[in-house]
């Protein structure tokens, strides 16, 4: 996925109220913009960090600039939580995720479960439908190891339970973790920050849910899925 025009570099001053950030552009202009990530963004909001912004001229927007990427640990990291579904769809259609290849139809936001919508429903004659839920990942504490979640997520645990229900009903159920950085070779479930999600993940795997992780090549000019990442196993004492 290309950014046209390319993103604008800036220096982060602060990110606050979850939705807002202050920054200074390269010409010295101080700006306030919108942050398309309501999560903790743990480790990605250090004042003075180099960041990249998209620019929008729509008169209906309150803020002209949107926070898109940040340099952290020597690599560029995507922070826009609206991006993973777009990247996943592009990668699935282009066959870049082998585990999800071979489906001729892809539908977005289909109703399923208990008043929920699945990110993607993949269909192919002669094969069970595949329900695919996508999660955004950018948290890293140990070099080369991405982790999810970076804070407690009841909604995430609910998604795992509903995927398990679909798997037991005979459908293919897939949790796809999309990592918006390229400096990782492994991914694991972050049990210390959200033990409830970790238990829900293990239960889902036992019910037949599949889990895959992919990383992205990220730059101010483009972002795309670049390869698969091994998922570390984590087993709780009690299911």
From Swiss-Prot:
Disulfide bonds: none annotated. It holds the Pfam family SfsA_N. GO terms for molecular function: DNA binding. It comes from the Bacteria. Belongs to the SfsA family. This is Sugar fermentation stimulation protein homolog. The gene is sfsA.
